[in-house]
Amino acid sequence: MVLLLCLQIIVLFYYGSRKAGFHEDELYSYYSSNKTAGLFVNDREWTTGESFRNELVVLPGEQFRYGVVKQMQSWDVHPPLYYYLLHTVCSLTPGIFSKWQGISVNLAGFVISFILLAYAAYLTAVYPISMQPEPSDSQKQAYRKRGYALAGTVCAMWGFGAAVISGVMFIRMYQWLTVFVLLCLCLHLRALVRKRENWKFYLLLAVTVFLGFLTQYYYIIFHFFLGAGFCLYLLKEKKWKSLVAYVGTCAAALGAALVYYPSALSHIFKGYRGTEAVGEFANASNTLERIQFFTGLFDKYMMGGFLAIWLLLICLIAVTNRFLQKRAKRSGREQKRERILTPPVGLLLFTAAGYFFTVAKTALLLGETSNRYELPIYGVLVLLLVYSLYMVQKEMEQGNAQAAERIALMASPNLPKEEIRKQNAPGKKQKITGKAAVLVVVLMAALNLTGNKVFFLYPEEAGVQEFVHRNETTPVIVLYNEASETHIWWLLDELSEYENIYLASISGEGEILTSENFLNGNAAESQKYIIYMADCENQGEELQRLLGTEFPDGSDASGEISYEEVARKNMWTIYEICSVK
């Protein structure tokens, strides 16, 4: 497992080195974690790239200002815990803005998630032994081996998933939401296996609910279904005191989180995302479309496009096995078989289905980037698929071994029964199954890591970044749209590299190059400018109007004007203009 984790970390560092740009939400993560003076648009005025950069980094003397971070999030629609973590890392590296600060936070979350998912898989596999009053040492050892095998297979498929790698590359809170989802799941599975809930369980539960809620509000959706399933289990077992203690602990932890962060109520019930989510959930007409959309994402970015084959294979083996069981029952040779749908599996299935459906109904539809909303349960879904396939295949092997034993007894009645059982034991088949599992994991990893399925890397930004670094001293004119002036902040990582920047609204009157404010700037006499222009109708005509210059394609006959489109990105077009005076 350690070797597997190290290999996956190496893969993550490889993709981290390829990350060349940022999603606008990632830039907001840095800004809302490290704000200094705030971002303001002063129309038709010069500013410096340093003033933008100061909003992305922690300046010396401004480290560990968690109160500012909390206040910034209260003005947005998210809880603050993830931003505390990012601010901490940036505080330890003051004055630096780097993708590795955010990736390192997510990488730590990935490692913790890996360990928790492995533990969840192990607990799911060994649960049946807890149902036996006095299991033998050999039985315990067999179930432990099963647990290790299941944990290794699940973590390998999960950690090499394109969606999971993308989640680490995306500098937002979803990887840490996965941490608390899996931590909460492990607490409940452990309680099922041990069949008791002590004070340590309730203490860890309270901490998990508190921190999970302060990481992302989707945590409540997960815990609602997990808690409902666990309460049904407590009711079935008639553990009345445990039920009261469980509900009380969850309510107290949630109440403490709301007392600490009261803005959460307005975010959920009055914020634009909360009201949008409620509206989408109430709209029954889009249910099938949304479920198909998110199922397709899981299939493509986690299962390599083979989800249908997995499900078909599980169903075929299960149906065949059921047929053989019925035939054995009619002939009086039915053998006792291990249950597949154990309480842990039922809890996993109920929770994953509830979360998947609710999030599919309420989350934003943003193409492949919408994977982040279902990311916290991708490990659970992989666990359910691998466990189901393993168990139905194991039942088939068990049935075949028993049938072979009966045939051997009839053919060789003089042979000792133990010798016949040893000859027909499924040991070799288990080795074949293990090799097949390794082959499947390698195939799934290859399918996930090829075809440019890992996103949030923005490799096309590499050329733009080179252009920016070559022109750091060139004055920049940002022509923004007043209706969407916040789109300026989508360019923060680039604008922070330039020395002088002039902001001007596209709808403004008068030529920019001859305006008093422009001429008073230190860069007014430059013979070259970089133009960032927001997308708009008649963009070329608007550009000429604002600069008071007609630009022919390429250069004019006298060579006095050079006009070139450098790149298009995020609703912006970058131009390079030389000798415009």
Regions found by a protein language model. Name each.
Residues 242-291, 301-317, 321, 354-356:
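Membrane-lumen/periplasm interface segments of specific transmembrane helices
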Residues 101-141, 183:
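Transmembrane-helix motifs of polytopic, lipid-linked glycan transferases
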Residues 1-55, 252-264:
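Transmembrane signal-anchor helices characteristic of membrane glycosylation enzymes that use polyprenol
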Residues 144, 149-152, 187-210, 244-245:
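Short hydrophobic alpha-helices at membrane interfaces in multi-pass membrane enzymes
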Residues 116, 160, 175-195, 204, ...:
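Specific aromatic-rich, kink-prone transmembrane helix
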Residues 2-5, 149, 251, 341, ...:
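Signature aromatic-anchored transmembrane alpha helix within multi-pass, membrane-resident enzymes
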Residues 177, 221, 363-403:
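Hydrophobic/aromatic-rich transmembrane helices and adjacent perimembrane loops
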Residues 154, 200-217, 250-255:
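Membrane-interface alpha helices of multi-pass inner-membrane proteins
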